[in-house]
């Protein structure tokens, strides 16, 4: 259904499409099917698949996208962090940040014309592709003539990061609850565990210094500060210990996400 609705929307001339599918329900395979149908029909000949982590690109290339092997390439560094786009391929795999030049260097995506790609699929588009100030947005705006498909499990509607504004309302939604009811996903249980510094906050002793020898600002650090403004080494050990203990209690080889 997701494939049909996406292809139908594109056939109607819709240039931005959003597909929402819960984690573990087959977003990547759905992306493959969409690309396969549009590429085979000749509707889309040059395709760019964007992700934010190498493991997602590498895994996708050897698994779901394996049938594209003969005409698929990954945009990688050719030396000193410089990326090169070989125009002879048809399906391109890339990390968002690899297409945006490092400070003082030109953006690699400028090597090709704005109409080079016919189709761009943005994996995990909630991670920032729709932010006005995002580097990823530069890529999407440059290739604005291409049909752009955003795929996510968690659409955002935050100010400045609203992928509903950018891609439009989803043409298809497959929720976590639906996945559980259909038997594709296992039911889950939320276990809440709290550490004293998360609940009560933490205030350094007067004159206390950090690991770099700098004096820590004297104030109450609350939950939202921990992990951002400061890191408490002992807290990490406590978290690791509790997670390890939980895995031993429930069976350390139990399948989880």
Predicted regions, residues:
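ATP-dependent helicase/translocase motor core
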Residues: 1-46, 55-71, 87-91, 97, ...
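Conserved catalytic network of the ASCE P-loop NTPase/AAA+ motor domain
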Residues: 40-42, 84-86, 111-114, 140-145, ...
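Short glycine-/polar-rich loops that comprise or flank the Walker A/P-loop
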Residues: 43-45, 71, 116-117, 144-147, ...
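Residues immediately C-terminal
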Residues: 56, 98, 126-127, 156-157
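Structural recognition of the conserved hydrophobic beta-strand(s) that form the central parallel beta-sheet
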Residues: 92-95, 147-152
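SF2 helicase catalytic motif II
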Residues: 110-150
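Interdomain helical connector at the RecA1-RecA2 junction of SF1/SF2 helicase-like NTPases
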Residues: 161-254
């Amino acid at each position: 259904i997701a494939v049909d609705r996406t292809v139908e929307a594109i056939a109607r001339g819709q240039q931005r499409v959003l597909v929402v599918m819960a984690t573990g329900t087959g977003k990547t395979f759905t992306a493959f099917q969409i690309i396969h149908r549009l590429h085979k029909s000749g509707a889309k000949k040059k395709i760019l698949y964007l992700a934010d982590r190498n493991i997602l690109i590498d895994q996708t290339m050897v698994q779901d996208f394996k049938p594209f092997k003969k005409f698929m390439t990954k945009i990688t560094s050719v030396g000193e962090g410089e990326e090169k786009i070989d125009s002879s391929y048809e399906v391109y795999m890339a990390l968002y940040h690899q297409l945006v030049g490092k400070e003082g260097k030109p953006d690699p995506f400028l090597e090709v014309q704005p109409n080079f790609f016919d189709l761009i699929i943005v994996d995990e588009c909630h991670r920032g592709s729709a932010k006005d100030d995002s580097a990823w947005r530069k890529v999407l705006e440059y290739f604005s003539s291409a049909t752009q498909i955003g795929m996510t499990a968690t659409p955002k509607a935050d100010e400045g990061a609203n992928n509903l504004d950018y891609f439009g309302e989803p043409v298809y939604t497959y929720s976590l609850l639906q996945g559980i009811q259909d038997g594709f996903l296992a039911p889950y249980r939320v276990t809440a565990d709290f550490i004293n510094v998360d609940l009560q906050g933490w205030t350094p002793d007067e004159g206390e210094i950090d690991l770099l020898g700098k004096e820590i600002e004297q104030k109450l650090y609350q939950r939202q500060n921990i992990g951002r403004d400061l890191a408490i080494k002992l807290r990490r050990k406590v978290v690791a210990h509790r997670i390890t203990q939980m895995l031993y209690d429930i069976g350390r080889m139990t399948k989880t996400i």
